[in-house]
Amino acid sequence: TKNGPVDFQPREPYSPLFTAIEHTDQMVEFQVTQEYLGHSNHIAYLAPMWKEFFEFVPANSLKAVAGVANIGTDVNWCGHPFAQSNWYAFGRLAWNPSLSSEEIAEEWLKQTFTTEAAFVNPVKDIMMDSREAVVDYMMPMGLHHLFAWGHHYGPEPWCAIPGARPDWMPSYYHKADKVG
């Protein structure tokens, strides 16, 4: 079951299936790739999002954790060096969901770059703020699916493609248009 009920949006509630289905083993599916979070063009550290999920759905109620990674042909497989931190965070939280996002970010930075506090501390702060920064401009006012046609890099609430499926258009979900 996907962690949220929509489709790996920058912010969405956890899927109600996790608490509604009591007698069925479940596995959560997280999206490690940054499809709706700027692909690999933006720093979007996802551990805080996954920690939010585990605050509502106890890890011991799950049988497994899966991740959609979508590696590419880039030298580092991820496109952006900081996208690798999400792979690391996914593995660490799958193994031990009680770890904090900050602990994981610090571990990854020290193992990847340097142990120097002058680097680790400010970059960890950037990582910890990154997902909220992406949410703020990808989902202004909490509105989701505002993405441009043909890519998910940024908002395009005015998008209207003749003949396209209505549920693929930004205004379908929130009914906002140029008049309000």
Regions found by a protein language model. Give the residues of each.
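Active-site capping/gating regions of soluble enzymes
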Residues: 1-68
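C-terminal non-catalytic alpha-helical accessory regions
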Residues: 61-69, 73-180
